């Protein structure tokens, strides 16, 4: 595991063309713009957590895959490759890549919806940053579902051969994130009192950047 401040190509184990993409993404805004342009990984073959190399090749990603790519790009430019996990109740967790500017936290995020996106570096603490996702983070039953956030996890603690240069799913990353200390955002009493999304919010929440492709029926299938 490398503890270098700046990642070289050989540290990540990527090819020249792959590394060149990360070299071009030299600001958090450029990284976020790149993630916006990646299509959504709808996991047609089942649950996936594909390394950076596979995401660069496939040109699609979901949240943790985008967060790993963003963290790799930050590391290439001398910033620590930090992830933060947000736990939800009866809902999917969300993972973002963290960065700081003048002591304030921001987040780079890959999502297919309107809400759990980029956050400008204006948050004094990770709790503040996580709370910025609180109101819109809702499950399919329209209940606000965000409950916890984690300490930053430094991806340099895991061999880049697993999460950057690998070809197989990097399940060690979410497993290690699960072990990181998490902090509650609301008490149980507060959680019970949270309101559901109103009808207008539900309409907005239905907006998606990329539509799930329809499965093509083979000839003769029913």
Predicted regions and their residues:
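A structural boundary/capping signal
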Residues: 1-222
């Amino acid at each position: 595991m490398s503890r270098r401040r700046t990642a070289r190509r050989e540290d990540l184990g990527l090819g020249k063309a792959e590394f060149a993409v990360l070299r071009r993404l030299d600001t958090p805004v450029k990284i976020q713009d790149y993630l916006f342009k990646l299509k959504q990984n709808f996991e047609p073959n089942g649950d996936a957590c594909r390394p950076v190399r596979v995401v660069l090749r496939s040109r699609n990603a979901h949240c943790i895959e985008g967060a790993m790519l963003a963290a790799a790009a930050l590391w290439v430019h001398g910033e620590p490759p930090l992830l933060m996990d947000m736990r939800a109740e009866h809902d999917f967790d969300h993972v973002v890549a963290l960065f700081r500017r003048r002591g304030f936290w921001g987040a780079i995020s890959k999502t297919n919806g309107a809400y759990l996106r980029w956050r400008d570096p204006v948050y004094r603490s990770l709790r503040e940053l996580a709370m910025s996702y609180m109101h819109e983070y809702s499950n399919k039953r329209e209940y606000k579902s965000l409950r916890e956030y984690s300490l930053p996890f430094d991806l340099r603690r895991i061999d880049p051969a697993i999460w950057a240069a690998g070809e197989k799913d990097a399940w060690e990353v979410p497993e290690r994130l699960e072990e990181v200390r998490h902090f509650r955002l609301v008490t149980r009493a507060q959680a019970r009192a949270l309101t559901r999304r109103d009808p207008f919010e539900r309409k907005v929440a239905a907006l998606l950047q990329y539509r799930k492709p329809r499965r093509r029926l083979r000839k003769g299938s029913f």
